[in-house]
């Protein structure tokens, strides 16, 4: 996946945002200090609140739990969730109640949920750049490892994987894919009822809406600042006009929307829909390998780029097993764990590491083989709008179309 950035937040600007912190951060721990963290972690149980909507991800976390238990004596419990916002509410309530041994030790997070926890001082840290494995993170090539939805991370969450909005279709049904949001409207008009997107606030649905917002605004500068009512009103004029034109041509005339991208993928596989969407550029290749999609399915990204980001793990300020959580975060960043996560036979989630920083033996863990269904021509990753835009955008969408 490329990590070129375009338009308002250019690659040069993104690099500038992180270059000032390329030196070893003030909070970096010595080897002795890290050994003390590992010693205190032994025997702890880490309750990792993470989305459970994928069998592959669940299986990966089971594998990680076994490795962490054997190597570090830390028990990893996957608390399966469907909505990270609910975890944020729980941590907020526990902190307000003065509970110092909270029920959440680690949470899979990014975007608006990270922004909320950061603003409300609900996060432990900074800790991320003190992790021994952080030295291999590609902070220059993948600037979103330090900038989360235009919000500086500041060591309060550890990068875990990369994501970029990607579409896929069956070449037998869609020989030429629409490569822009304008082309998507033309495609929907030509193929009524065969296109849709998940209902916001589903993550993939909100991402589709944000992609349209970004693409339809020639001047994107306001999107990368904290949202205001005036900025929201101005920036969404072309968005609502576009969606008003698009929806009558969607599945069920835009009166109903599927609840998830998984549902859309199944409907596409069954022939009911023509195009599906994902935030994992390797998802179609995964599904082809598992015989759940035809090998005539191909993946693509829009010509002007698509939204891309990093997903992270963070430790709540009242976590009971802070040392154990740091050990887990460090393991998840290790070359062995990142390589297994990137393996299409396992999860297929792109790595946050700079492979050229690794010794040859660890670099060899990462496969360079191209498989059917992978993105043939990766496009630039466009930075996500500031996290403060998400909630008001979703609320306005629901008011208009929900």
Question: Model segments located where?
Answer:
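N-terminal secretory signal peptides
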Residues: 1-26
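C-terminal segment of N-terminal export signals and the immediately downstream linker at the start
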Residues: 8, 25-44
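Conserved C-terminal helix/tail region of periplasmic/extracytoplasmic solute-binding proteins
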Residues: 33, 266, 371-402
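Short, polar/charged alpha-helical segment
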Residues: 34-42, 49, 54-75
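Extracytoplasmic ligand-binding site segments that recognize negatively charged/polar headgroups
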Residues: 51-63, 78-86, 103-262
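Short beta-strand->loop
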Residues: 124-137, 157, 185, 289, ...
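Extracytoplasmic/periplasmic substrate-binding proteins
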Residues: 251-314, 357-365
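Mature extracytoplasmic/periplasmic domains
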Residues: 306-307, 311-377
């Amino acid at each position: 996946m490329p990590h070129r950035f375009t338009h308002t937040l250019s690659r040069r600007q993104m690099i500038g945002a992180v270059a000032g912190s390329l030196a070893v951060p003030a909070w970096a721990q010595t080897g002795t200090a890290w050994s003390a963290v590992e010693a205190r972690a032994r025997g702890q149980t880490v309750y990792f609140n993470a989305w459970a909507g994928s069998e592959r991800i669940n299986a990966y976390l089971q594998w990680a739990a076994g490795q962490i238990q054997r190597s570090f004596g830390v028990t990893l419990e996957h608390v399966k969730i469907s909505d990270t916002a609910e975890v944020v509410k729980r941590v907020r309530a526990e902190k307000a109640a003065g509970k110092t041994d909270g029920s959440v030790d680690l949470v899979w997070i990014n975007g608006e949920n990270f922004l909320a926890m950061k603003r409300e001082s609900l996060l432990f840290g900074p800790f991320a750049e003190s992790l021994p494995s952080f030295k291999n993170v590609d902070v220059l090539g993948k600037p979103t490892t330090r900038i989360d939805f235009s919000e500086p991370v500041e060591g309060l969450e550890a990068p875990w994987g990369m994501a970029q909005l990607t579409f896929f279709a069956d070449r037998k049904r869609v020989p030429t894919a629409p490569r822009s949001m304008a082309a998507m409207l033309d495609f929907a008009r030509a193929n009524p009822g065969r296109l849709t997107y998940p209902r916001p606030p589903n993550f993939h649905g909100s991402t589709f809406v944000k992609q349209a917002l970004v693409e339809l605004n020639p001047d994107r500068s306001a999107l990368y600042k904290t949202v205001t009512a005036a900025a929201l009103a101005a920036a969404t004029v072309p968005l609502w006009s576009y969606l008003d034109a698009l929806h009558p041509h969607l599945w069920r005339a835009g009166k109903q929307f599927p609840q998830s991208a998984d549902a859309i993928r199944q409907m596409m596989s069954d022939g009911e829909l023509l195009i599906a969407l994902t935030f994992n550029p390797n998802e179609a290749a995964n599904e082809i390998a598992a015989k759940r999609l035809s090998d005539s399915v191909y993946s693509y990204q829009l010509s002007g780029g698509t939204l891309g980001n990093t997903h992270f793990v963070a430790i709540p300020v009242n976590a009971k097993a802070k040392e154990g959580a740091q050990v887990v975060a460090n393991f998840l960043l290790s070359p062995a764990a990142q390589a297994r996560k990137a393996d299409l036979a396992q999860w297929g989630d792109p790595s946050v590491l700079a492979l050229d920083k690794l010794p040859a033996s660890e670099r060899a863990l990462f496969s360079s083989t191209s498989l059917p269904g992978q993105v043939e021509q990766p496009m630039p990753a466009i930075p996500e709008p500031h996290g403060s835009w998400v909630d008001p955008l979703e609320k306005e969408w629901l008011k208009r179309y929900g």
